[in-house]
């Protein structure tokens, strides 16, 4: 069924709005996948806070042209599914990477974190990006480490003194 102009404009506006809020985008070719497999991918995407959309490439180019992901335009060929990471920068890449382990028909073709087009070879690096909570935990651990070492050092002085006294007592 052909889309009318109004429907196309709605799709472009929707994808453009989601892209403007997204932290990163992963694009994958889904050629040969069955509907049940795509449904399973969509369920996993909802669980992980990733917005998935299958859009005609010409509409996607229009939607992405005014966003920070305009660099993806050159990679939009073939039947593609777009994953927009809303909550974590590596969310869509992680979703596609994990799903591709069990389904070889899903091939990631391009990625973008807003700073340029990344090829599929960068999938592991983008998927390894920490979530907000993980990044905050690492930051707090970095702040906490020097204080912990200082307390440990200050505590070592009386402990060492007690061990010396115990050693002297044992020798007498």
Curated annotation (Swiss-Prot):
GO terms for molecular function: large ribosomal subunit rRNA binding. Part of the ribosomal stalk of the 50S ribosomal subunit. The N-terminus interacts with L11 and the large rRNA to form the base of the stalk. The C-terminus forms an elongated spine to which L12 dimers bind in a sequential fashion forming a multimeric L10(L12)X complex. The gene is rplJ. HAMAP family: Ribosomal_uL10. This is Large ribosomal subunit protein uL10. InterPro entries: Ribosomal_uL10, Ribosomal_uL10-like_sf, Ribosomal_uL10_bac, Ribosomal_uL10_bac_type. The keyword Acetylation does not apply. It holds the Pfam family Ribosomal_L10. GO terms for cellular component: ribonucleoprotein complex; ribosome. Keywords: Ribonucleoprotein, Ribosomal protein, RNA-binding, rRNA-binding.
